[in-house]
């Protein structure tokens, strides 16, 4: 299956021909992806809203998880 979006041949993290991450890349896009690497754990990826605290990267994924109250 696809590891990344093949739509843009200019993405330095994704091989547009195969839809696979390029060698050494952890991710191609996402709020917790920076220059083909996962952002460090606890990096803020979404600013606090109302009573909810900031959402932070896990260091293991390009996705920005919603705060779960734990």
UniProtKB/Swiss-Prot annotation:
Residues 1-70 form the Disintegrin domain. It comes from the Eukaryota. It is found in: Secreted. GO terms for molecular function: toxin activity. Expressed by the venom gland. Disulfide bonds join 4-19, 6-14, 13-36, 27-33, 32-57, 45-64. Its main location: secreted. A motif (Cell attachment site) lies at residues 49-51. Keywords: Cell adhesion impairing toxin, Disulfide bond, Hemostasis impairing toxin, Platelet aggregation inhibiting toxin, Secreted, Toxin. PROSITE patterns: DISINTEGRIN_1 (PS00427), DISINTEGRIN_2 (PS50214). The disintegrin belongs to the medium disintegrin subfamily. Monomer. Belongs to the venom metalloproteinase (M12B) family. P-II subfamily. P-IIa sub-subfamily. Inhibits fibrinogen interaction with platelets. Acts by binding to alpha-IIb/beta-3 (ITGA2B/ITGB3) on the platelet surface and inhibits aggregation induced by ADP, thrombin, platelet-activating factor and collagen. This is Disintegrin triflavin.
């Amino acid at each position: 299956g696809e590891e990344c979006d093949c739509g843009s041949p200019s993405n330095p993290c994704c091989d547009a021909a195969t839809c696979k991450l390029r060698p050494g890349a952890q991710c191609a896009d996402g709020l917790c992806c920076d220059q083909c690497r996962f952002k460090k754990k606890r990096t803020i990826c979404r600013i606090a809203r109302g009573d909810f605290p900031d959402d932070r990267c896990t260091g293991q994924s390009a996705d920005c998880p919603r705060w779960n109250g734990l």
